[in-house]
């Protein structure tokens, strides 16, 4: 089965995914805009990793209007759409997806925010929308150029039905493997996306509170201790939500510390970078949402409350 892929957003998440799929020979179209799009079209996407190792990969890229114009002229719909935008931009993709998709198009959101798949499915009831997330540390450093921090690139996706027999999603698993991406077609995707959130949310919260990059969190001390406390609070919240994340106490802390310690020392979260630049960020979904859920489920999250209050003051003072 030969699938046509669309990647909405070619930044630190969608850029590498689109580049790897394109390099493997998969029919892949990246949706972007502005200067980033112009460079992608002229020079391809450049991935920078390690000690300034650079690889430029030819990609097919277009903006939303251009793709819809092509659809009106008879261009085929994508079989699979990976949604790789920031959480605050998710709603903006819905009208485009409605027009770009075909009847059998499958939508796979891989955002940082927990519950994205359910939210998108409610907006697109006519399409099949999975839950999903991605493990990657990368960011755009210039138009057409993505800096990777570490080798990990894992996409987790699946359906609330717990079934893993959908032929398109099975083919996605094969195509991702062929592209050098680690796929997890999960029968327990709600748990697995919350597992990802239990890493990225503490990482973003701790990093923003202490203005710390990975290096400060990779060594014993207050910053690393805070990261651990945040993980434990998400675990407690998940237990109250009926989605246990651990088979034994401390398991998730150990797992997340291994992920953290494998990052380049210069790595930081996209939320931190956006907040430092005064841009719109995912702070609501990554920090404040945990406090709201804790109130809803009656869970004490003192570390999150402390950080949420401090971050609100930081933003109010800017």
What name fits each language-model region?
Residues 57-145:
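Rossmann-like NAD(P)(H) cofactor-binding subdomain of soluble oxidoreductases
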Residues 45-64, 200:
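N-terminal glycine-rich dinucleotide-binding loop that anchors FAD/FMN and/or NAD(P) in oxidoreductases
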Residues 1-54:
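NAD(P)+-binding Rossmann beta1-loop-alpha1 motif at the extreme N-terminus of oxidoreductases
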Residues 2, 178, 228-318:
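NAD(P)-dependent Rossmann-like dehydrogenase/reductase catalytic/cofactor-binding core
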Residues 76, 112-196, 202:
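Rossmann-fold dinucleotide-binding core
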Residues 190-218, 222-235, 260-261:
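Active-site-proximal catalytic alpha-helix in oxidoreductases
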